Curated annotation (Swiss-Prot):
Keywords: Cleavage on pair of basic residues, Disulfide bond, Hormone, Secreted, Signal. GO terms for biological process: in utero embryonic development; male gonad development; regulation of male gonad development. Disruption phenotype: Male mice exhibit bilateral abdominal cryptorchidism due to alteration of gubernaculum development. It comes from Mus musculus. This is Insulin-like 3. Transmembrane segments: none annotated.
Length: 122
């Protein structure tokens, strides 16, 4: 008799529990973003051998970032005054595409942990 009543109270308590507040957004740019990605994604587990030196794991992360073109957003937008070979229209198009990049968005408006998990390689 007590067990069903206890189970009902537990179910009622979990149903009445207030919803979780939205995840906090953190603005992450440059090396702060890379370090957070390593922490969130579990960087050391990426390497085939846990005995790999730290430099090798860092190199692996940087290679992965380059493959995903995420480092592009970590670098400042190209200034047409610095590179006269770039047409003005191409430069504007490049800035617009960078604004939609998830890494660039993390730097400008912030990312949640869920956003960062979407950037993980696995």
């Amino acid at each position: 008799m007590r067990a069903p009543l206890l189970l009902m109270l537990l179910a009622l308590g979990s149903a009445l529990r207030s919803p979780q507040p939205p995840e906090a957004r953190a603005k992450l740019c440059g090396h702060h973003l890379v370090r957070t990605l390593v922490r969130v994604c579990g960087g050391p587990r990426w390497s085939p051998e846990a005995t790999q030196p730290v430099e090798t794991r860092d190199r692996e992360l940087l290679q992965w970032l380059e493959q995903r073109h995420l480092l592009h957003a970590l670098v400042a937008d190209v200034d047409p005054a610095l590179d006269p070979q770039l047409p003005r229209q191409a430069s504007q198009r490049q800035r617009r595409s960078a604004a939609t990049n998830a890494v660039h968005r993390c730097c400008l408006t912030g990312c949640t942990q869920q956003d960062l998990l979407g950037l993980c390689p696995h």
